[in-house]
């Protein structure tokens, strides 16, 4: 929301040259993301392990607590699918529980490394493929092992939003200093660094096109291809333009739909 409002303020000419510099300083100063990208996976991992432990802890036989198993099956969906899950969980042994635990351990370790690597080297499809390798280990993993690629996509979009907003301000400062728009991002001052001009989805420069109406700044989004800066409001989630572009335009700011 802050970055969106900042770009609309830029569009309406709210700032003079000095204020542009101050605003850009604030945007870059508070763009600090030094937390481990995978820190929150610990909770997901712990929940899965705890569920397995509770199901099999304290039972007299080799199988799970059937009353708790029924609750788990109900929580993840009722009807015929829930009954089928319950039958499969009820038939599990402690060896099956250990297999599920091993799958969770390996999955969350691999997923954490993928999240730390991030785009452009690890994309949503890669994370989905990792989940697919372990989700069918047994009935418990099918219930408790999630695909979390969507989290990484949204996290990367947020980072893209922050960088593109800073870049929009840097381009406007160039215009204020030189009386013209930069012909390419290479003309921007080195003091801005490479980070704000780098599209997280590609690891390369944001899309930048200059026309008589001014610059267009856009992300190449999930497919990593330059689709000409044709705006897709919902990125790749819902493409409604004729060119099937998933490019997301940040400058000029786009009206909300």
Question: Which role fits each region the language model picked out?
Answer:
Residues 1-257:
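Short acidic linear motifs
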